[in-house]
Regions:
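Residues lining hydrophobic/aromatic ligand-binding pockets adjacent to catalytic sites
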Residues: 1-248
Length: 248
């Protein structure tokens, strides 16, 4: 049985794919393969950072933040045009740390997901642990949107995230194993390069992932586990270890 049944597409965070790009993917992927694409950041950042890539928009408020019409037209439509549906995994909305209150953020999510088509699946990844809680959980549950369990620098462990969430919120679950906890992106990158071996196992990450995947499976939830080389040094070897643990 193949280990690689899905992939996370990070490039779509910077620009949504065109229908022609998606059509080219169709010619390269197996029949039962699904792609989990990050949503264009134009939809997920309330204010543009003071970064050169934003040009004259740097530091300004983003009028397309949680704009359902923009998402449907600019992000979803190419998938429809390319007839990519059977290969479309959950769309991943990555929200960087921001200045919104829990109430503001959850209210925005609620109105946004209420307007989205129900024939696609959506998942939210937050980078601010303070957002985890009943209000966030309820909004996701109401719209069958998954929380992305992200093993990332400033987030709590996967087990603690689930403890705060209490239950899964959608008929599917998503895990992104990205960096060791409390380690910056650059430090994790330096540690992991050249990505050809396990440079340091993360036992808690592995154990939490296996336990939560088993729980999701016992509840008949489809599960997507996306692993970055920066987590342990070599994503395929991490995936192989997780699969072996799941088979025990």
């Amino acid at each position: 049985e193949p280990l690689f049944r899905t992939v996370g597409n990070d490039a779509t965070f910077y620009r949504p794919p065109t229908a022609s790009q998606l059509s080219r993917y169709l010619n390269q992927i197996p029949e039962d393969f699904e792609m989990c694409a990050k949503v264009w950041e134009e939809i997920t950042i309330p204010t543009y950072a003071t970064h050169a890539r934003y040009g004259i928009k740097a530091g300004q408020r983003n009028p397309n933040f949680l704009n359902a019409d923009a998402f449907i037209k600019l992000v979803l439509q190419p998938y429809r045009d390319a007839r990519f549906g059977p290969h479309t995994g959950p769309f991943l909305f990555e929200f960087q740390r921001h200045g919104l209150s829990v109430q503001e953020f959850c209210s925005g999510l609620d109105g946004f997901f209420a307007r989205l088509p129900k024939d696609f699946r959506y998942a939210v990844e937050i980078r601010n642990a303070g957002m985890l809680g009943p209000q966030y959980h309820e909004v996701l549950r109401r719209h069958d949107v998954a929380h992305v369990y992200n093993h990332w620098t400033f987030m709590p462990s996967l087990a603690e995230q689930h403890q705060r969430m209490r239950t899964f919120t959608a008929p599917f679950s998503v895990f992104r194993l990205q960096t060791p906890l409390r380690m910056t992106h650059e430090a994790a990158k330096t540690r992991a390069e050249p990505y050809n071996r396990i440079v340091g196992e993360l036992p808690e990450m592995r154990q939490d992932t296996v336990r939560l995947v088993r729980q999701a499976a016992s509840e008949n939830r489809t599960t997507y586990v996306l692993v970055n080389n920066r987590a342990e040094g070599n994503a395929p070897l991490t995936i192989q270890a997780l699969v072996e643990s799941l088979r025990e």
